[in-house]
Amino acid sequence: MIINQSEFSVSAVKASQYPEGGLDEIALAGRSNVGKSSFINTLLQRKNLARTSSSPGKTQTLNFYRVDSDQADFYLVDVPGYGYAKVSKKQREEFGEMIQDYLETRAYLKGLILMIDGRHEPTVDDIAMYDYAQYLNLPILLVATKMDKIKKNAFNKTEAAFRKHLNLNKDNVTFLPFSSVTKLNVDQVKDWIQARLYEE
């Protein structure tokens, strides 16, 4: 897949604000500060398309990015990060409802890229999101982020830790180590997305 053009489209907190037009969508989920913005910028080859921040909890809406590629046009949808303790309980509940409504009702959603910090074992929140995506029967790309901070000979240890906590043996799950710094597996992510688009 070759990305020809990409742009921020719209922020939404409810279904009436979602973009129209019938394009397929791929959602991005992960803990706050897991590296979703860097992932988007790296994948779409745009330096500051998604704003990166050292402060977790910045994304508080569903952010839709329209992507035009040589294969198909689609939306990449950045979902608010979970597991951020400094937002109020009420805000966490609102985020949860917004994410749930989108993941459970959006007909154009074709898959979920779940991002987990590869330097650590999956958290309780990571496992809950993974199990929820399995419950919804969504195709899942499990991305271990920040792998440039891990020695290459420890990659197998990272994958083993993920396999210990998550059932990665399902047909609808793909695991990839990833780095926005070294561009590790960027093409493989694009291949996974391409395979999801407009499949029946």
Curated annotation (Swiss-Prot):
Q: Does the keyword Ubl conjugation apply?
A: no
Q: Which PROSITE patterns match?
A: G_ENGB
The record's section on InterPro entries has: G_ENGB_dom, GTP-bd, GTP-bd_ribosome_bio_YsxC, P-loop_NTPase, Small_GTP-bd
Q: Which cofactor does it need?
A: Mg(2+)
**Superkingdom of the organism of origin:** Bacteria
- Assigned keywords, A-Z: Cell cycle, Cell division, GTP-binding, Magnesium, Metal-binding, Nucleotide-binding, Septation
Which Pfam families is this protein grouped with? Answer: MMR_HSR1 (PF01926)
An annotated GO cellular component of this protein is: cytosol
Which residues make up the binding site for GTP?
30-37, 57-61, 78-81, 145-148, 178-180
Q: Where does Mg(2+) bind?
A: 37, 59
**Alphabetically, which GO biological process terms does the record hold?**
division septum assembly
Q: Name one GO molecular function term.
A: GTP binding
The EngB-type G domain covers: 22-199
What exactly does this protein do?
A: Necessary for normal cell division and for the maintenance of normal septation.
Looking up PANTHER family in the UniProt record yields: ENGB-TYPE G DOMAIN-CONTAINING PROTEIN, MSS1/TRME-RELATED GTP-BINDING PROTEIN
Recorded family membership? Belongs to the TRAFAC class TrmE-Era-EngA-EngB-Septin-like GTPase superfamily. EngB GTPase family.
Q: What is this protein called?
A: Probable GTP-binding protein EngB
This chain's source organism reads: Lactobacillus delbrueckii subsp. bulgaricus (strain ATCC 11842 / DSM 20081 / BCRC 10696 / JCM 1002 / NBRC 13953 / NCIMB 11778 / NCTC 12712 / WDCM 00102 / Lb 14)
